[in-house]
Swiss-Prot record:
This is RNA-directed RNA polymerase L. A motif (Nuclear localization signal) lies at residues 844-852. The gene is L. GO terms for cellular component: host cell nucleus; virion component. Keywords: ATP-binding, Host nucleus, mRNA capping, mRNA processing, Multifunctional enzyme, Nucleotide-binding, Nucleotidyltransferase, RNA-directed RNA polymerase, S-adenosyl-L-methionine, Transferase, Viral RNA replication, Virion. Residues 543-715 form the RdRp catalytic domain. InterPro entries: Mononeg_mRNAcap (IPR026890), Mononeg_RNA_pol_cat (IPR014023). Its EC number is 2.7.7.48. The keyword Acetylation does not apply. PROSITE patterns: RDRP_SSRNA_NEG_NONSEG.
């Protein structure tokens, strides 16, 4: 809200006016014309009289202001801007070379040069500069009237808040806001043109600047009435979407474009849009999404408010019908809530079942399960009432309340919203006013006044359902920058209602929304990005399509009757009287007035009178944005009912009225029919709920997806950088924008532009240009014309005391950098190397001066900061003023007493205490500091820095002082730049490795070594190389990227098959712990975090008496007096420290589409990723940097056809992170700050740390087994159509593989078995589990497979050696699946195994998992790799006939190759990827033979071998650096058909001669062209055969017999499960039967028919159809494997049949 009005009239300001006029520099308020029309009608206010004197005979209405501004023409080339071009080129060169991406230079160069020299762009730029100069001269000025000012051919006269613009004989009287709107439009167009030149240079279709210029010209020439003009502007974007869908939809039709009138109103624009559609649909969507460059309409207040008040009352349905439909919605809400609750907590919420409730619900509740049948039978839930699930949090955190919201103090104050002169003019009476306002008009002031000291008392009336009369008034405020001519309105309420709002919405957000799956309200922006990328991709694959719903005035449609039933249920869930129900009926008793200062309603005895335009007494809804969360829940409820009614599979994702529905295709109906039925049902149910769905404006598409202003075309985000960059403003909501805040705002806008784009380059290059333009407007010519000074200025960022700049914004590539200093030094190093800038100039600009004393407080708040003296920033000064102002105020409130404390001094004292840490670890200091009350106090002061708050908060701060303060800051920056003295010499720090330099620079400024802060700059630590010509040395430590196909420019905008990489999911290392019974307050959370950190330090072996003292003081100051130090589950460990964040989904700084074409992995960083130590590597940055390299090669015209790698280049950048111990050297002086937290915190005493005598490794393993089991059960129920990201239920992803390797997995697996036996699965759950494991799907199974990539773990895990002979497995995944299923395959053995776990561990709680893992880190040992054998040959061997791969086709080939290798006595063998992987695997098992695979940079073949191997042979015998570097062989090789040193096999035709060892030899072996004689080779004895080469079940007759019996009983169990496809299991069993028949000498049939089924509740598997109920299954292609022959020789007695079940014997014996 602006204060034009409030600061200008004496009658309305609380102190003598310091006449500051026009207090804004960019448009922040709605455009209203009422003051102008009042001025034209009456001449009662003195400045209105002055304004009327300036008007010409032809005066445009203020709403047509844009017609006049369109005619402004400037003389060409007024401003010299050559220096900007050269500086921009220099800056971009330096940035690009610092990142080692030099191939981008040319492309960026030409784009910047073209952008700043093209005459049209330049003219627009000069216009923008001219506007900004005027704005700078007239805003915040003491003179009321300024003028005339020239703007090209226009003259401007500023008279207080009014402006008269004149061209020739036409004038236009408008408000200052109208002028700002025109200035903003000029700025927006200037930015748009520059951004589009850069974008055009960087994408394959080439430049599209002409189209943009053409579009500007067409729009400026539209000569239509005001409303039609803005109708066109508003419909450009949706019309373009309609055009794209009309052309590119595949399975559904769309005539959305026909809704808009553009073709009739403006045919030129229509043809331009269609031309763009021809060129490229993405270009059309990108250009048309720019809506803020075409002026803003003035809001038509009378029509707008009349329509708004009408909508708040109109009734579509009768109240009775709404109430009954409300009850229907309540049933589905209960069903959805309980379903979500069960899947999250594995139990039902507390419920009360009414009489007549269905029996299936009772059963499900007792079992704590959810039956899928309830989805169809949701009506049953009308008999279920959910009881109390949580309490209302009655003491919301200050941070939630202290946003800068306007409130109206009480109902009596309504008259202060209007101008008295306007009332007199309209009604001819005086406006009666109280002598003063009854209270503050901003929330913050109410806080300072102590109105919020007792929130529960404020809310008490809502519990009773009786709201004070004084609170029942709402002001509807028009919203700014809206393209709707009739405007949108937001509510401004009284304090009590505002707080009620906060508490009710927070309760829903925290306790109800997380269980509902149909909205994105509780998702972080990163989680949402991941989700939308996934969704938009599924739509384009043809499996589903999307319906985008458009409700007409959604917010105004919710009637009290519809909400009453659900509100009653919410009151029961929170046990809070009438709290939620009060909210539904509140609008019926509230008076609404429209905020329009010059058009007041009539006042009758002090009350506003209803007139339907400016005032309404009692309506049916509260207006926009009030109960958003409740309404979102209701909307999704009726959508679910509608879609279930027509029986489709669907997902809903919605937030407010932005609802999208994804419908999956069905086998019986085509998509078009589904879409029409769905829309019909949705319309019907919306109507029942009293809403109107505009069906013709709902669109259906399978190529576009739009959600929350993000737009996707064919699964790829449409770059939003044009839209973002055209809206870059320098306004941050600051009271007075200063240089620092303007630049900071600009850099963060560039950041968000990059986030909306598929490449960071556009945002970076445009950002640099806009930054230079901003400096051009702000700084004097002396600085601007000095090119090297300007360049250096832009490359010195805040980390060494400079201004914020896009150049040091690595966040264009990554969001945030863990340590900005090395990057900053690398930039300056490159600057000196590549341009002619000298080091002394750098010293002059940086002026590094070490602060006179160490400022520990700044180190604690930002651990990466340097201790240097900087120019004092305005906000710090303003902050001091605020503190003083509040402290001197006379109020006695919690906040005032809080401010009277010496906050900053106490914070400095604590920081000084922490600085005695030896060694000095700033990250630990920061974590400790954050737990104190002082840190909390400082965070609250920061909230008070927002603009208007400050001014109104203290009568002492004048706007003028603030304005002067900003001027002072700018002047001191300018003085500093013009002053030629140099600061500290930076030369030594700009040479060599920046990681070391940064450490030294920190040491220099702080006087001590800082540990654990510096992180290397990624482009120095790793260098990109192509795999062509890469030597083996590069592969020693490398990250390898393999393109899916040859990548060219069109790959930058299409999706590949790899997952989209937006940064690793840096998983939470510790789950948020709950200390049960802790109240939900900020204090309690801080107590919890303190206890967690303390516990964490104990586990980390940091035991220091001073630290204990400090921790005790932290607890005491929060009112926690107990001595119990409970062991807690929780706290996240980031950078080796617990912090409060949840899982931080890492984010690259842009949408990294190219990553979907690249496979990459860090498995080949041998020294770092394989070790369990931690090193200074930020993997997320490294991975992103690799993708960025490919992106830049392609953008600069190259192609990527071969794999490439990032190899570790700077050895000093890798530093091992050592142990974390520290001590505090001195007794802490900090005594605590008790004044802050009002409620004492208690923790239930019964929690004690009983689990000390346990072995942490066993405890951790035991818990992990249970968590894996629970996650499996949740996975079974998850549907494949669920849109949320597939993560394990217990968040297992948070554990790193190196942590997992240190646990004894035999215990983990036994614990999992114990859990599965105890879980007593229902039939459908068992079937689900078996189906899921056989298909190898589900996040939990993927987690297990990731852990078991390490064969050593797999072999160590479970008593595999004892059990493997009983398991018939085919591959590693199959083995893991059967291992998990063992309790169902052979319950007897499993029970014996499980009983081995010591029963004392049953008391261990899996909630403490993280602490056990942390403790196990130091004691656990990694299992050693061991290599098992294959059968080997020697010249004089002893025949035993045991051959590897005995089941496979290539077994003989493999034996011959092994003989050749031994005959030739080879030490090194090259193998090409064309060789059968099984043979290669066998060769890897030969001892004393080094294998080199000819990979040529692509590790896929090696990974295949690793996956097949079940011991450590492949990983230990393949020389991986040489394999990756090898493109051809240099020695003996297997694979090619010819060439020197090639061993090849020739299959013999008919004559197979005997061989002493192999019965018949199928191959002759040749080396080059010579025959190798292998006739004398014979077997070596075999001790430990590898399970991958010799199936354990065929190893002896005994093991085969056991496996056969196990498998038989398992198949019989499976037959009992309804709805499970038995075929694959039967085929597996049949493999064993064939071998059994061969052993018994039975004839083996090629094809067999089985009859399967359940007869009299018993399973039947027979070869004869003796009952009609049996199902027939045919198994063909049967042949015994070669191992069978060996077993047959072994079984001469026929002992196989002894003791077999009769049914099994019948299957074996063929009659």
């Amino acid at each position: 809200m602006s204060f034009h009005a409030s600061l200008l009239r004496e009658e309305e300001t609380p102190r003598p006016v310091a006449g500051i006029n026009r207090t804004d520099q960019s448009l922040k308020n709605p455009l209203l014309g009422t003051e102008v029309s009042f001025c034209l009608k009456s001449s009662s206010l003195p400045h209105h009289v002055r304004a009327l004197g300036q008007i010409k005979a032809r005066n445009l209405a203020s709403c047509d202001y844009y017609l006049l501004f369109r005619q402004v023409v400037l003389p060409p080339e007024v401003y010299p801007i050559g220096v900007l071009i050269r500086a921009a080129e220099a800056i971009l060169t330096v940035i690009v070379s610092a990142w080692k991406l030099d191939h981008m230079t040319k492309t960026l160069y030409s784009s910047v040069r073209y952008a700043l020299t093209n005459p049209r762009v330049r003219a627009q730029l000069e216009l923008h500069i001219a506007y900004q100069r005027i704005v700078g001269q007239v805003s915040y000025s003491r003179e009321a009237d300024i003028g005339p000012k020239r703007l090209g051919n226009m003259s401007l006269q500023f008279i207080q808040s009014l402006v008269i613009a004149t061209i020739d004989t036409t004038s236009c009287l408008m408000t200052y806001n109208h002028f700002l709107a025109a200035a903003d439009t000029a700025k927006s167009r200037c930015h748009l043109l520059i951004a589009s030149v850069v974008q055009g240079a960087l994408w394959e279709q080439g430049s599209f600047l002409d189209h943009i210029i053409n579009m500007i010209d067409i729009i400026d020439s539209i000569n239509l009435p005001h409303d039609d003009y803005f109708t066109i502007i508003k419909s450009i974007f949706p019309y373009s979407q309609g055009l794209v869908m009309g052309r590119h939809n595949v399975s559904v039709s769309s005539d959305f474009a026909s809704v808009f009138a553009i073709p009739e109103l403006c045919p030129q624009l229509d043809s331009l849009l269609k031309k763009l559609l021809q060129l490229d649909p993405v270009l059309l969507l990108m250009v048309s999404s720019v809506q803020k460059s075409w002026y803003f309409p003035e809001i038509r207040m009378v029509d707008g408010s009349r329509e708004q008040l009408h909508k708040m009352r109109v009734e579509l349905e009768t109240p009775q019908a709404l109430l009954s439909y409300g009850h229907t919605l309540l049933s589905i809400f209960r069903a959805e809530f309980i379903k979500g609750y069960v899947s999250k907590n594995a139990k039902w919420p507390p419920v009360h079942l009414l009489p007549g409730c269905d029996k299936s619900i009772k059963n499900a509740r007792e079992l704590g399960r959810w039956s899928p049948a309830f989805d169809r039978r949701w009506q049953l839930f009308e008999k279920v009432v959910i009881l109390r699930i949580a309490d209302l949090d009655m003491d919301p955190d200050f941070n939630d309340i202290v946003s800068d919201k306007a409130i109206i103090s009480s109902r009596r104050d309504w008259v202060f919203e209007y101008n008295a002169a306007a009332f007199w003019k309209k009604y001819g009476e005086r406006l009666e006013r109280p002598p003063a306002r009854s209270g503050p008009s901003r929330l913050v002031n109410a806080l300072i006044d102590g109105r919020l000291d007792n929130i529960p008392a404020l809310l008490e009336p809502f519990y009773r359902g009786a709201v004070e009369f004084e609170d029942r008034l709402t002001v509807l405020v028009p919203k700014e920058k809206e393209l709707k001519v009739k405007g949108r309105f937001f509510s401004k309420q009284t304090l009590a209602i505002r707080i009620y709002q906060v508490v009710a919405e927070a309760a829903l957000k925290n306790e109800v929304m997380p269980y509902l799956k149909t909205h994105s309200m509780t998702m972080s922006s990163t989680a949402l990005t991941h989700l939308l990328n996934r969704l938009s991709h599924t739509i384009t694959k043809g499996d589903s399509f999307v319906i985008n719903l458009d409700y007409s005035s959604w917010c105004n449609g919710f009637r009290p009757e519809l909400q009453a039933p659900i509100c009653r249920q919410l009151d029961q869930m929170f046990n809070c009287g009438y709290f939620f129900r009060t909210g539904c009926t509140l609008p019926c008793f509230t008076t609404f007035i429209i905020q329009d200062r010059f058009n007041p309603p009539y006042s009758l005895s002090g009350e506003p009178v209803e007139d339907g335009v400016t005032c309404a007494v009692g309506t049916k809804t509260m207006g926009e944005g009030m109960r958003q969360k409740l309404w979102t829940i209701l909307t999704s409820c009726w959508e679910i009912i509608a879609l279930r009614e027509i029986n489709v599979t669907f997902n809903i994702l919605g937030q407010g009225d932005n609802q999208t529905i994804i419908i999956h295709k069905s086998a019986s109906q085509n998509n078009q029919l589904l879409a029409e039925r769905a829309l019909g049902a949705l319309y019907k149910h919306a109507r029942l709920a009293g809403h109107n769905l505009k069906v013709e404006e709902c669109w259906v598409s399978d190529c576009l997806y739009e959600y929350g202003k993000k737009l996707f075309f064919r699964g790829v985000p449409v770059p939003g950088c044009l839209k973002q960059l055209s809206r870059v403003t320098d306004s941050t909501g600051e009271l007075f924008p200063n240089l620092y805040s303007k630049l900071a705002c600009l850099t963060s806008s560039c950041l968000s532009a990059a986030m909306a784009d598929t490449s960071p380059w556009v945002a970076l290059a445009t950002g640099v240009c806009l930054y230079l333009i901003e400096l051009y407007v702000e700084l004097p010519p002396a600085i601007i014309q000095d090119e090297s000074l300007l360049t250096t200025l832009c490359l010195v960022g805040p980390s060494i005391g400079g201004l914020p700049t896009p150049a040091t914004l690595p966040s264009v590539f990554f969001r945030g950098m863990s340590d900005p200093l090395p990057f900053q030094l690398a930039l300056l190093q490159t600057l000196i190397k590549t341009t002619g800038v000298t080091c002394s100039l750098v010293n002059r600009v940086v002026k590094l001066r070490i602060a006179p004393y160490p400022d520990w407080l700044s180190l604690v708040t930002d651990p990466t900061s340097l201790n240097i003296a900087q120019v004092y920033r305005p906000e710090r000064q303003i902050r001091r003023w605020i503190e003083e102002a509040i402290a001197t105020s006379s109020h006695s409130s919690r906040i005032a007493t809080f401010f009277q404390q010496p906050l900053t001094e106490m914070a400095q004292l604590l920081a000084r205490d922490l600085s005695t840490m030896m060694p000095l670890r700033p990250r630990d200091m920061s974590a400790l500091f954050a737990l104190s009350n002082v840190a909390y106090g400082l965070s609250i002061i920061d909230l008070f820095q927002k603009s208007s708050t400050v001014v109104s908060a203290s009568q002492a701060v004048h706007i003028e002082d603030v304005a002067l303060e900003s001027v002072r800051y700018k002047e001191s920056i300018i003085q500093g730049l013009l002053d030629t003295t140099e600061g500290y010499n930076m030369q030594p720090y700009l040479e060599g490795c920046t990681y070391l330099a940064a450490k030294q620079l920190r040491r220099l400024t702080w006087g001590r070594d800082l540990v654990g802060v510096t992180m290397p700059f990624v482009a120095e630590q790793f260098h990109p190389h192509s795999s062509v010509g890469a030597k083996a040395e590069l592969y020693l430590d490398a990250i390898i990227y393999c393109p899916q196909e040859t990548l060219r420019s069109h790959h930058l905008t299409t999706r590949g098959d790899q997952p989209l990489y937006l940064g690793s999911n840096t998983a939470v290392k510790v789950q948020r712990g709950e200390i049960t019974g802790l109240a939900k307050s900020r204090a309690a959370n801080l107590v919890k975090d303190t206890l967690v950190l303390h516990q964490w330090y104990k586990v980390r072996k940091v035991t220091d008496p001073h630290l204990n003292t400090l921790m005790a003081r932290f607890l005491l100051e929060k009112g926690y007096t107990s001595d119990a130090r409970p062991s807690i589950q929780g706290g996240t460990l980031t950078h080796r420290l617990p912090s409060r964040g949840d899982s931080r989904q890492g984010l690259t700084g842009y949408v990294n589409i190219l990553s979907t074409w690249l496979r990459f992995s860090s498995d080949y960083l041998h020294s770092f990723s394989k070790s369990s130590d931690d090193y200074t590597i930020h993997f997320q940055h490294v991975f992103t940097y690799g993708c960025l390299y490919a992106d830049s090669v392609i953008r600069s015209g190259g192609v990527i056809s071969t794999p490439y790698l990032l190899s570790a280049s700077c050895k000093t950048c890798f530093e091992k992170i050592d142990s974390e111990e520290f001590v505090l050297a001195c007794e802490p002086q900090y005594r605590g700050a008790e004044w802050l937290i009002s409620k004492p915190v208690t923790v239930p005493e019964q929690i004690t740390d009983a689990e000390v005598e346990f072995d942490p490794c066993v405890s951790a393993s035991y818990c992990l087994g249970i968590l894996i089991g629970k996650s499996f059960l949740v996975d079974i129920r998850a549907s494949g159509h669920d849109i949320m990201e597939q993560r394990t239920w217990a968040n297992l992803e948070r554990f790193s593989v190196s942590d997992m390797q240190k646990l004894p997995w035999s215990i983990v697996i036994r614990s999992l078995w114990r859990f599965l036996i105890g879980a007593r699965l229902l039939q459908f759950e068992k079937a689900g589990l078996i189906r899921m494991l056989y298909a190898a799907t589900g996040p939990t199974f993927s987690f297990l497979m990731k852990v078991f990539q390490d064969s050593a773990l797999l072999m160590d895990c479970a008593p595999l050696d004892r059990l493997s002979p009983r398991i018939n497995f085919h591959s590693r995944g199959d083995l893991v699946a059967k291992l998990v299923l063992l309790p169902f395959i052979n319950p007897g053995i499993v029970e014996i195994e499980v009983s081995g776990i010591n029963s004392k561990y049953h008391a261990v709680s899996e909630a403490n998992m993280d602490l056990y893992i942390a403790a196990a880190k130091s004691v656990g040992v990694k299992p050693t790799q061991f290599v098992e054998e294959t059968n080997d040959f020697t010249a004089r061997g002893h025949h035993h006939g045991c051959y590897s791969l005995s089941w496979s086709k290539s077994r003989n080939q493999s034996q011959v190759l092994k003989m050749v290798v031994r005959k030739l006595k080879l030490c090194v063998l090259y193998i090409y990827p064309t060789v059968d992987p099984a043979v290669a695997l066998d060769l890897c098992h030969l001892p004393a033979l080094t294998i080199i695979l000819v990979l040529g940079g692509d590790p896929a073949y090696y990974e295949r071998l690793l996956e097949m191997d079940l011991c450590g042979a492949v990983s230990s015998r393949v020389d991986i650096p040489h394999s990756l570097a090898a493109r051809t062989h240099r020695g003996f090789a297997v694979g090619p058909d010819a060439g020197p040193g090639v061993i090849r096999l020739d299959r013999l035709e008919s004559v197979c001669y005997a061989h002493p060892c192999l019965e018949e030899l199928e191959f002759n072996a040749y080396l080059d062209s010579e025959l190798v004689d292998i006739s004398d080779m014979c077997c070596l004895p075999l001790a430990t055969p590898c399970k991958a080469l010799f199936r354990p079940i065929y190893r002896s007759l005994q093991s085969f017999r056991l496996a056969l019996m196990d498998n038989y009983s398992f198949v019989m169990d499976l037959i009992m499960i309804r709805g499970l496809d038995i075929r694959p299991h039967l085929e597996e069993f049949d493999e064993l039967l064939v071998v059994g028949q061969h052993i018994l000498g039975q004839p083996v049939l090629v094809e067999v028919v089985y009859y399967v089924g359940v007869v009299r509740k018993r399973p039947v598997l027979a070869r004869h159809p003796w009952s009609a109920d049996l199902k027939r299954i045919t198994v063909g292609g049967r042949a015994p494997c070669p191992s069978a022959a060996r077993l047959r020789d072994e079984d001469c007695q026929g002992s196989l049949l002894v003791g077999l079940p009769a049914g099994l014997t019948q299957l074996l014996i063929i009659d």
